[in-house]
């Protein structure tokens, strides 16, 4: 199992929740700890005639380090997740759209990290297969 250490903020919380689900939180004593730093940026992509943005791109960049419990770092990586969303004139709708964008970006980032770690673990096990007890 892998213990996931959550970065601060809403996107960090969502990312940790998705990774906990994917990596089997509580299934066994963790052999690794996954720590992450994330940067979230929002860029205007669609602009109305009055020069007000009505579409945004949300980019989530995650730098992660997988550390063996009781040891040092064994794997590092960087992934980038980008999604777009509409921004409505109504404040609540705009907030809901931004939160939906954060949710989709975190889900996409978690899938990318999960696949990266799965590929690394499979390669590691292929090089040094475990001896049955």
Regions found by a protein language model. Name each.
Residues 1-28, 122-133:
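A structural "domain/chain start" motif
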Residues 22-27, 66-70, 112-125:
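Sec/Tat-exported extracytoplasmic proteins
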Residues 26-78, 83-100, 104:
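Surface-exposed short loop/turn segments
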Residues 96-133:
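C-terminal/domain-edge helix-coil "capping" segments
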